[in-house]
Amino acid sequence: MQVYAVGGAVRDQLLGKPSQDRDYVVVGATPADMEAAGFKPVGKDFPVFLHPHTKAEYALARTERKTAVGYKGFAFYTGADVTLEEDLVRRDLTINAMAQAVDEHDNLVGPVIDPYGGQKDLAARKFRHVSDAFAEDPVRILRVARFAARFHEFTVAPETVALMRKIVDAGEVDALVPERVWQELSRGLMEAKPSRMFDVLRECGALAHLLPELDRLWGVPQRPEYHPEVDTGVHVMMVIDYAASVGASLPVRFAAMAHDLGKGTTPEDMLPRHIGHEQRGVKLLEAICQRLRVPNDCRELALVVAREHGNIHRSTEFGAAALTRLVERCDALRKPERFAEALLACEADARGRLGFADKDYPQADRLLAARDAAASVDAGAIAKACGDKVDQIKDRVHKARVAAVAQRLGMAEE
């Protein structure tokens, strides 16, 4: 029985990066051998075992073959006769198909076992598939795209791009379950340069299948006086990357991705203006969230940003009444943290333009001040003062909030 660290741990050590992955493969063992050594079996589809002390997962070396469409359509074989090279050949990329022995202290020891040229591709900053078996699992397209967002200086080998296109053309991407698509997209959004993920998905044609609402933004013009980058798709990528550069949360990054979807449906005779794109975008966003089963925190923030980002940008022109209505529509009094994240997404939108990355965004501080002023109003006391006239409560509370905002910001109520 020999234990190896495989994949990310070896790759990241060679790159001089802290490892986010720790996967182990055991060669020359049977399930009975593992249990006899104190490991606990947990795998459903193939033998995976928990270490008796660290609880880390150890998988028996295995081979696999395709049996059906989709990422679950595989049959596996594990046995003491499966070699390390046979296990590594089923992996996605050469840079992930390397192994190294581990000692009793979990240190990587001995030579790097690299039968498929992973070290060469690391040096060349290249993503290359190990074998044509790559085509058997469509999730690998998403994984390559996600790796591109993490290792954004890497490029995809031309032959790998061609193979990814074949997978897309064969309809394999359409068979992916929504939860797995969202899992990979959300991971990619949280990497250092999320735009690279979408670049790769566009290059192989997968984005048009997975997120057609986003894919159609490329080539859609915007007014150059507001958007020197002109292309809407380019703008959205700049917005996502800005959000990533300030360490924004997943909901903010998703909102950044989805804020301008409505521009993809602007009538041609209206271009490069996009009147009403916010409302059109909300409908498209709802469809994406339902299709991919997007978590509620991401969905709710993205909807607020898609609907209100234009008003938030223009809010420096608003009086106290309009500011208060905007704060109320955003539900900022009940959900102040979400409101702050909406403002961050809008700041990313404003700065995600050519030449605007360092521009001030006074709208955020102004709206936060308006929110705080509106929140200072004692709605309970107003309700009590209204007595039986309950139909007046909402209007009186709103007027009190407007007055508080006007006083805080030193402006007229209208």
UniProtKB/Swiss-Prot annotation:
Organism: Cupriavidus metallidurans (strain ATCC 43123 / DSM 2839 / NBRC 102507 / CH34) (Ralstonia metallidurans)
Complexes and interactors: Monomer. Can also form homodimers and oligomers.
Function: Catalyzes the addition and repair of the essential 3'-terminal CCA sequence in tRNAs without using a nucleic acid template. Adds these three nucleotides in the order of C, C, and A to the tRNA nucleotide-73, using CTP and ATP as substrates and producing inorganic pyrophosphate. tRNA 3'-terminal CCA addition is required both for tRNA processing and repair. Also involved in tRNA surveillance by mediating tandem CCA addition to generate a CCACCA at the 3' terminus of unstable tRNAs. While stable tRNAs receive only 3'-terminal CCA, unstable tRNAs are marked with CCACCA and rapidly degraded.
Details of cofactor binding: Magnesium is required for nucleotidyltransferase activity. Nickel for phosphatase activity.
Residue positions binding Mg(2+): 21, 23
Residues given in the record as ATP binding sites: 8, 11, 91, 143, 146
Gene, per the UniProt record: cca
Protein's recorded name: Multifunctional CCA protein
SUPFAM superfamilies on file: Nucleotidyltransferase (SSF81301), Poly A polymerase C-terminal region-like (SSF81891)
GO molecular function terms noted in the UniProt entry: ATP binding; CCA tRNA nucleotidyltransferase activity; cyclic-nucleotide phosphodiesterase activity; magnesium ion binding; phosphatase activity; tRNA binding
One of the GO biological process terms: RNA repair
